Curated annotation (Swiss-Prot):
Note: Active towards carboxymethyl cellulose.
Record's protein name: Endoglucanase 2
GO terms for MF: cellulase activity
Organism: Sclerotinia sclerotiorum
EC number(s) from the headed UniProt entry: 3.2.1.4
Catalytic activity reported: Endohydrolysis of (1->4)-beta-D-glucosidic linkages in cellulose, lichenin and cereal beta-D-glucans
Keywords carried by this UniProt record: Carbohydrate metabolism, Cellulose degradation, Glycosidase, Hydrolase, Polysaccharide degradation
Any one GO biological process: cellulose catabolic process
KW ATP-binding (keyword) present: no
Length: 31
């Protein structure tokens, strides 16, 4: 799955994710 800053495409968790799905930093964003 593709992960990006904001929300994970699969799961809906907020934060910054790397390509491997590792949380780099907790950044709750509003969408």
């Amino acid at each position: 799955n593709i992960y990006y800053a904001g929300v994970a495409e699969s799961g809906g968790e907020f934060g910054v994710y790397s390509g491997s799905g590792t949380v780099l930093x907790x950044l709750p964003l509003t969408f």
